[in-house]
């Protein structure tokens, strides 16, 4: 099977790169092992919330020079501030073309509410999320935090209590919703995605509206767990119209409706453009030459995927894009050079809340995001997203930005080579 580009990994980075290439007529295939980090995400996208020294960032573009000084191996530093600034509007436009409704812009971080009622700096938030610092932020002065009876993945009392400490007159209550009684009988099935599949049905809408209107009498907004709007945020806006007040969603424990919705929108866009996705498959090895890369997958061992270019978007330890052994960290498909601490004692810190060194382990790349094998740069192979070295997506608040920007950066490199 022959393609222009083979992408290993079907998460945020892989899909974004594939969409951009497919928009320009490239024939792309994505080998996706299964669930990715989007299934566990809040649906919000961060760009840069903190520098490595802990300094908070409000205007990410203004912080790129200092980031390069503190973290020269950070993917943004590798790409360069000028490239990052040029790509950011393109990222936002690509997401809009993919029919993804987001609030925010790259000039200024805003704040999104976490599942515990606290606020975290953010670049782009779901249109039905709870935000602060945007013209469209509207979670009210006395919101109702509406939980769901028996649903343990969202604690409305904790959220309301946290908001009260911030001077917001929030209160909590729980929806009974008899339509969910069958799900309640099996706690392992009483999860956000399964609830959303029921609440998104038109025949269940009136019961939801009726109960919410009773609970929220006297409240100026409703904040509830993201247990509806699996396929589209329009369901949430229709509910808000019926109630006459804003209805906003907070992410729950995984699997995340907001993250799944983002993944579905990107996957649909890629397929609409003619892209091929091989779900449930896994790249196991590859052979390289200067003219072609052949990728062998678990289900197609004897029939490799051949392409002039390959893009590794396999993620970090979470998705086995990086693998640890007792004394080293490896990249299992290509055997890329990986930067990691030589002494295993330096891989982590005892304090679980402290920045963990292993989070910054990853593939060594140049400014074009070409990786190395045994010290030699491979010019028709690229690495993007969480497999890259030099950044901590949690502490620095830059995981989504690295995935999106590195994906477009590499797509542009491939397109330039095809159109000199």
From Swiss-Prot:
The protein's name: Anaerobic glycerol-3-phosphate dehydrogenase subunit B
Pathway in which the depicted protein is active: Polyol metabolism; glycerol degradation via glycerol kinase pathway; glycerone phosphate from sn-glycerol 3-phosphate (anaerobic route): step 1/1
Species in which this protein is naturally found: Pectobacterium atrosepticum (strain SCRI 1043 / ATCC BAA-672) (Erwinia carotovora subsp. atroseptica)
Cofactor dependence: FMN
Keyword Nucleus assigned: no
Alphabetically ordered keywords of this record: Flavoprotein, FMN, Oxidoreductase
Superkingdom classification of source: Bacteria
One Pfam family named in its UniProt record: FAD_binding_2
Uppermost EC category: oxidoreductase
GO biological process: glycerol catabolic process
Record's catalysed reaction(s): a quinone + sn-glycerol 3-phosphate = dihydroxyacetone phosphate + a quinol
Keyword Transport: no
Function, in words: Conversion of glycerol 3-phosphate to dihydroxyacetone. Uses fumarate or nitrate as electron acceptor.
Family membership noted in the UniProt record: Belongs to the anaerobic G-3-P dehydrogenase subunit B family.
The EC number(s) this enzyme carries: 1.1.5.3
GO cellular component terms, A-Z: glycerol-3-phosphate dehydrogenase (FAD) complex
Subunit structure: Composed of a catalytic GlpA/B dimer and of membrane bound GlpC.
MF terms (GO), sorted A to Z: glycerol-3-phosphate dehydrogenase (quinone) activity
